[in-house]
């Protein structure tokens, strides 16, 4: 069997010290961190698998999706439906982060349809329900004239439905929304939420499998797996 330690690291905590003190055989890291983090973690000399990271250091194994392509599919869906004024709701747009990649996909779709990119149509916040509500309220109060929203996460889309409802706008009659992630909770919305589906559980499964393979044989070459997604 295996012992699993789940830890949220403090901003001031030494990741290298943490790994050594706990005598870890391998590590799975979720999300993006500063470059210093990746340089520090290499010093552990133990197998590490990254999930949802765009770190280009070949020391690491990496499991992710093509976030830009997924967001491109979402934006293109709305454009194919005739929308030319689609806003973009996102979490923090960190350089080389997932949200930045999803913004790039949105921009690519606009460009292909000859629709100008407008920064005023991009709303940035946290990836949570309250941010979705707040973004929708802000868009509803604005004079932008948006008719649709590409939400870079389902939880933002779910919050947005509430925010638009509170502002007197109906979804999808007055405002169309498409999400990203295909969270189970999105199935319970009425009407249902159109979303980009990624297999989140498969990310975890493949990360563990890859980590165990490299613990058993550290000489294995590093791998990057880009998992499928679909509308």
PLM regions: where:
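Residue-level detector of anion-binding/catalytic polar loops
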Residues: 3, 47, 84, 116, ...
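Hinge/beta->alpha junction and helix N-cap segments in small-molecule ligand-binding domains
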Residues: 6-15, 63-73, 89-135, 150-158, ...
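Residue-level signal for nonpolar/aromatic packing positions in well-ordered secondary structure
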Residues: 26-27, 48, 78, 106, ...
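Alpha-helical recognition/docking segments in bacterial nutrient-uptake
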Residues: 1-76, 140-141, 145
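Hydrophobic packing residues within well-ordered alpha-helices of enzyme cores
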Residues: 37-41, 106, 160, 164
């Amino acid at each position: 069997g295996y012992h699993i330690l789940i830890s949220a690291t403090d901003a001031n905590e030494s990741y290298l010290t943490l790994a050594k003190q706990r005598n870890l055989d391998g590590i799975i890291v979720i999300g993006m961190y500063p470059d210093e983090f990746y340089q520090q973690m290499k010093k552990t000399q133990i197998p590490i698998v990254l999930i949802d990271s765009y770190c280009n250091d070949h020391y690491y194994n990496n499991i992710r999706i093509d976030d830009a392509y997924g967001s491109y599919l979402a934006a293109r869906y709305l454009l194919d439906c005739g929308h030319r004024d689609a806003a973009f709701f996102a979490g923090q747009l960190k350089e080389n982060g997932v949200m930045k990649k999803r913004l790039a996909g949105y921009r690519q779709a606009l460009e292909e349809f000859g629709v100008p990119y407008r920064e005023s149509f991009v709303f940035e916040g946290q990836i949570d329900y309250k941010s979705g509500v707040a973004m929708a309220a802000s868009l509803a109060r604005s004079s932008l004239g948006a008719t649709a929203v590409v939400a870079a996460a389902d939880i933002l889309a779910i919050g947005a439905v509430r925010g638009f409802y509170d502002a007197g706008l109906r979804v999808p009659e007055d405002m169309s929304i498409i999400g990203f992630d295909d969270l189970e909770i999105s199935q319970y919305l009425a009407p249902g939420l159109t979303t980009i589906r990624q297999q989140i559980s498969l990310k975890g499964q493949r990360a563990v499998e890859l980590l165990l393979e490299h613990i058993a044989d550290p000489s294995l070459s590093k791998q990057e797996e880009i998992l499928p997604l679909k509308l």
